[in-house]
Amino acid sequence: MVRGRNRRAARRKRAAKRLKMQMWIDAYILQWDLDQAQKDLENARTRMLTEEMERLEEEVEMLMRELELLERMEEDG
């Protein structure tokens, strides 16, 4: 009777150890996934900011050309 209980307790202890180890592994994987997602998000933000800056630079160049044209028209007319 005692021996059976010890076996059951040992079995439960091993199962608990396996479960705990699996939980640690899952937590590590989730943390890695989170880190990767944060890096991807930062890269996307950088890419979006770069695209926005390029768009704004083009807009500024266009406005500068328009201003030059207006100045020329003013000088001519």
From Swiss-Prot:
Where does the protein end up?
Host cytoplasm; Host nucleus; Host nucleus, Host nucleolus
GO CC field:
host cell cytoplasm; host cell nucleolus
- Keywords for the protein's UniProt record, in alphabetical order: Host cytoplasm, Host nucleus
Signal peptide from the UniProt entry: none
Q: What is its main location?
A: host cell
Query: Is the Hydrolase keyword given for this protein?
Result: no
Superkingdom of origin organism = Viruses
- Give the protein's function: May function as a nucleic acid binding protein that modulates transcription of genes participating in the IFN response.
- Supply the name of the protein: Protein NS4
Q: Record the organism.
A: Bluetongue virus 13 (isolate 13B89Z)
Taxonomic lineage of this organism? Viruses, Riboviria, Orthornavirae, Duplornaviricota, Resentoviricetes
Q: Which gene encodes it?
A: Segment-9
